[in-house]
UniProtKB/Swiss-Prot annotation:
Subunit structure: Homodimer.
Gene: purT
Function: Involved in the de novo purine biosynthesis. Catalyzes the transfer of formate to 5-phospho-ribosyl-glycinamide (GAR), producing 5-phospho-ribosyl-N-formylglycinamide (FGAR). Formate is provided by PurU via hydrolysis of 10-formyl-tetrahydrofolate.
Listed name of the protein: Formate-dependent phosphoribosylglycinamide formyltransferase
Binding of N(1)-(5-phospho-beta-D-ribosyl)glycinamide, residues: 20-21, 80, 284, 354, 361-362
Residues given in the record as ATP binding sites: 112, 153, 158-163, 193-196, 201
Amino acid sequence: MIGTPLKKSATRVMLLGSGELGKEVVLEAQRLGVEVIAVDRYADAPAMQVAHRAHVVNMLDRVELGRIVARERPHLIVPEIEAIDTPYLLELEQEGYTVIPTARAANLTMNREGIRRLAAEELGLPTAAYRFAASIESFRAAVKDIGLPCVVKPIMSSSGKGQSVVKSMEEIDGAWTYAMEGGRGASDTVIVEEFIPFDYEITLLTVRHAGGTTFCPPIGHVQIKGDYHESWQPMAMTPAALAESQRQAKAVTDALGGSGIFGVELFIKGDRVWFSEVSPRPHDTGMVTMISQNLSEFELHVRAILGLPVPEVANLAPAASHVVLASEAAEEVTFSGLDAALSVPETKLRLFGKPDTRPGRRMGVALSFGADTDEARNRAEQAAHAVKIVTL
């Protein structure tokens, strides 16, 4: 049952994090008559521009967060980013609030140590060999133990911040410093991972809902410095690799529990599959599903968290996405080149409306169909590169 927005009967959803993914969640929730409250650390975030109400708070401050939760009394609390006091979500859940998918899932996936130990040590899923280090001395020992090349990540970060590949012993101290600068929260721990020479990596969007578990067609993607740059669907895989990917995705999402969509990242080499990471929310590489599927990842997430039916998910046609990035910092920008971008065949454009820019900030995405994924990728790249961001 869903009530009437802005009335006593309203079904209220509080979104913690109001970026471009959250904006799409807001729109899909509102299409089903849900009242949405958007929260983030800065004003005029994309989801705030379309929500019924918005609050600007430091979500790492449980006092501030608790104040707005008590004021709004949401039926569902939906984390959209990692920069949240996730231990406090556990307390809110104990008080009777519903956290999506669960407070435990949000807490575990915020921390690479928590989710890696769950996947590798509790569930026995194949992963890259890894070590954790909380000092420069233990970091050097971990790199020596894992071997070169290796991948270094803060245990708490997002969008590739603080991640690097160490190829020589001379790079160790710089990698440690970079990880410390890119980490989020008070933790000074990093994970050192074996470098896996994979053929490709995928996101397997996995939906837990009242009727069971549904998998979307696999999404191929390219990351640059640990951050999503382009994605496409479907990604061609062997039947054995797809089956193993689905097995691993179901195992980890079942362990996390709750309802909603999960972005499960996996490395693939031939028929072999390694678990990498999981996000208990819509995934940035999944933006391609806004055109590629009969139901986008945002529609699927909203249906699942509201307890509504989730039918079979179908890929409509080969499609791809490519990011539009800012190159410099500015408090206000304009966009040119839209005529050229939208003249690319079978292409759409999404500009996120972020209030300011910084180098490398994602400001939009181009979405394209093609006769195959190669053509779709080329079209999306052409359109994205046609967009010019002009600082004022």
